[in-house]
Amino acid sequence: MVPKLFTSQICLLLLLGLLAVEGSLHVKPPQFTWAQWFETQHINMTSQQCTNAMQVINNYQRRCKNQNTFLLTTFANVVNVCGNPNMTCPSNKTRKNCHHSGSQVPLIHCNLTTPSPQNISNCRYAQTPANMFYIVACDNRDQRRDPPQYPVVPVHLDRII
């Protein structure tokens, strides 16, 4: 009985550790609203090269993000997608606040090729350009910190297809 109890406690601790790691990957820096963080991660590609553009995101998160997709469109265009019909989010079936882009957009997908946990400025990325549809989750804007011209804003890039 004791070995089973001990083993199950270890499994529970490992599972909780994995959940904590997974949950930490979806944390935004405190100075951003969810919409601002979406724009930083997925619209504002500060360089045409993934390695340089990802340094901005990695510096906020203090880690090398495994992958990221930049939509080569405007924030306003993505806000317009929030007006498309609601659908269940593919990555989280309990969320019903997703919207399909309806048309393909150019994008660049960045994939970590050289991790560097000790020095995030040494992380290197490969990039893949494409034209794809996307699904975005939208929520009401942060009343205190988001601009009032957009009552509903994108907060999560759920999927590219």
Swiss-Prot record:
InterPro entries from the UniProt entry: RNaseA, RNaseA-like_dom_sf, RNaseA_AS, RNaseA_domain
First-tier enzyme category under EC: lyase
Molecular function GO labels: lyase activity; nucleic acid binding; ribonuclease A activity; RNA nuclease activity
Known glycosylation sites: W34, N44, N86, N92, N111, N119
EC number: 4.6.1.18
Main location: other
Keywords from the named record: Chemotaxis, Disulfide bond, Endonuclease, Glycoprotein, Hydrolase, Lyase, Lysosome, Nitration, Nuclease, Signal
Cell location: Lysosome; Cytoplasmic granule
Transmembrane portions of the chain: none
Residues that coordinate or bind substrate: K65, N66, Q67, N68, T69
Gene3D superfamilies: Ribonuclease A-like domain
GO annotation, biological process: chemotaxis; defense response to virus; innate immune response in mucosa; RNA catabolic process
3'-nitrotyrosine, modified sites: Y60
Subunit structure: Interacts with and forms a tight 1:1 complex with RNH1. Dimerization of two such complexes may occur.
Known role: This is a non-secretory ribonuclease. It is a pyrimidine specific nuclease with a slight preference for U. Cytotoxin and helminthotoxin. Selectively chemotactic for dendritic cells. Possesses a wide variety of biological activities.
Similarity section: Belongs to the pancreatic ribonuclease family.
Protein name (database record): Non-secretory ribonuclease
Species: Homo sapiens
Upper lineage: Eukaryota, Metazoa, Chordata, Craniata, Vertebrata
Gene (UniProt): RNASE2
